[in-house]
Amino acid sequence: MNNTEFYDRLGVSKDASQDEIKKAYRRMSKKYHPDINKETGAEEKYKEVQEAYETLSDTQKRAAYDQYGAAGANGGFGGFDGGGFGGFDGGGFGGFEDIFSSFFGGGGMRNPNAPRQGDDLQYRVNLSFEEAIFGAEKEVSYNRESSCHTCSGSGAKPGTSPVTCQKCHGSGVINVDTQTPLGTMRRQVTCDVCQGSGQEIKEKCPTCHGTGHEKKTHKVSVKIPAGVETGQQIRLTGQGEAGFNGGPYGDLFVIINVLPSQQFERNGSTIYYTLNISFVQAALGDTIDIPTVHGAVEMSIPAGTQTGKTFRLRGKGAPKLRGGGQGDQHVTVNIVTPTKLNDAQKEALHAFAEASGDKMVHPKKKGFFDKVKDALDVD
């Protein structure tokens, strides 16, 4: 067995945190539980998951496993050089004592009957551009592990109760003796009868089959504050999955996703808008109604405005989540060049070019009246 097999059984990496290992164990344990999964080989997989978790959940045993593999985790010392204890500091036996104590249960065991909080959940909610700016209230619906309504989470058939496990006497662990080159060593492992709960269910609940949990659709109202952005999270305490041994529910993390706007763009509390104007408006100036999320605002365009010029509408942006106040809206001018001109428009532009002293590459085409003058030879 290599030094990553236990991690592979739980589907986590070798540098996984204890919290990640615990969540993976719960997930895999439910997946292969014999009372839920009737497929061939599920029970064996379940035992392998228990074995992996029993080692990786204990800091000292995990350290021994990472360094020496299964032999270290199970009490063997293969890998030591015959001439001494290579790898340990010659000034003391601190590292050896840590590993040695894990074989004898020196590190202690957690109370298997202690209440444990349920798993956290995530839910992604879509908001319109305006909802993200002004805030909203959304009702979200999702499936979660809830306390079984039939047995109230005990896992036992109504009218019955779990009893103290006869094998481990309620401790959740049993002692196992292992023969090693150093003699018989005793270590503690999770009880294979009660799976570490310390209690044995003789008559299982017909609804949850002894797990104490059942899948239910849950609805909750979420208040979205004004000014949120994509990727931000809102934590709803107690809206996650049911706990264990009477422990509290986990939390729900609502992840915000803001849908794009057809008119505006946004960065933090600043909103951006592109204003298309004509050459005439840019040259002569104009007063234009500018759309904002707060309603139309009248803005003056000075004569001679160039493409790319940006104006600021103060207080017309999004709320600032931190520090309070309101952001601004930036209006950037884009001068639109017409693609289709009628004869009158062309005449006017040619006249403008002549008045400006611009030299045209292509000479002005004669109009109808010019042609009449030429025909009559009129000056």
UniProtKB/Swiss-Prot annotation:
InterPro entries noted in UniProt: DnaJ (IPR012724), DnaJ_C (IPR002939), DnaJ_domain (IPR001623), DnaJ_domain_CS (IPR018253), HSP40/DnaJ_pept-bd (IPR008971), HSP_DnaJ_Cys-rich_dom (IPR001305), HSP_DnaJ_Cys-rich_dom_sf (IPR036410), J_dom_sf (IPR036869)
Cofactor: Zn(2+)
Record's keyword annotation contains Glycoprotein: no
One GO MF term: zinc ion binding
Keywords: Chaperone, Cytoplasm, DNA replication, Metal-binding, Repeat, Stress response, Zinc, Zinc-finger
Listed name of the protein: Chaperone protein DnaJ
Binding-site residues for Zn(2+) 2, renumbered to this chain: 165, 168, 191, 194
CR-type zinc-finger residues: 135-217
Biological process according to GO: chaperone cofactor-dependent protein refolding; DNA replication; protein refolding; response to heat
A GO term from the CC aspect: cytoplasm
UniProt KW rRNA-binding keyword: no
Subunit structure as annotated in this protein's UniProt entry: Homodimer.
